Amino acid sequence: LKVDSFLNHQIDVSFVCELGKEFYRLFKDENITKILTIEASGIGIACLTAQYFNVPVVFAKKTKTINIYSDTYNATVHSYTHKRDYDIVVSKDFLNKDDNVLIIDDFLAKGSALTALLMLIEKAGAKTAGAGIVIEKAYQGGGNLVRDMGIRVESLAKIKSISKKDGIVFCKQ
């Protein structure tokens, strides 16, 4: 599924602003205090969404760098794309028990990144308002996994299947 020309390599800012408006419409009554994403391709979407909520964006880093001096919340993500596990970190300075967090990301497939972000929120003692996903690969099960945990997941596009024969088949919303 190639979306790199407008979403996660080159960004069509006008389009992503519209995504942000839609996430705001869906979650505006949730009293969001922070938007959380994971580097790298979720950052642009999260930032343009955050402008409508007027809240900061926190992104989980895939490596702990020397400029993160404070204690951190940590979780492990399995990347099916890169076929490896990696740790993600968020400074305890930027996520705490008073936060009501909206997770924003470009894709949801098997749910590994999303469940790791949920772990960071839980470790901080914060509340999860939900997750806004641009494209959910419903056939990989991550969305149902997270919904079964009681988390509200709003996907702007849900793909039922992808095949050479039928192309991309979207779920009926």
Please state what every model-predicted region is.
Residues 1-104, 108-173:
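PRPP-associated nucleotide enzymes
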